[in-house]
């Protein structure tokens, strides 16, 4: 669940794009120095423009010397490596996300189940910090949070749209932009408080 959530919140990709990520050599490439990884989905995206076709996910390892003690535990590159190692013995599919229980053990995970993983991770994170989970939270909520935080930190709108596979900035401004510094339920995601910064 953790790696699914971290990829969702750091990439702003649709669940279909995350579900289509592959372990094939042409779709997953680690930086030689271990500083990051590039992943490509194995399907055609919803937005079929030259800009969005086969748009990769580029992840960079969090700085292990950061003053925030939890940063290393929230690093998507670290989590991805751990997940790949943990599923190596059961894997029956090149798809990145595979089932780890039930009759489909080791087989490709469905989009619906992947959505549940992300929602379960959010719910667990709130519970671990002693807070009730947001009502009506969806897997899609990660796209609003990820892109809104990016905008708040000065990332150009064109770069945000490219990462989220949106054809026009209007999609973000009308449907996804939220006030993550205010009372938006998921605004505190990946923003540790002093009470839970060591978890």
What residue spans do the PLM features occupy?
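Extended, non-catalytic subsegments within catalytic or DNA/protein-binding/adaptor domains
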Residues: 1-199
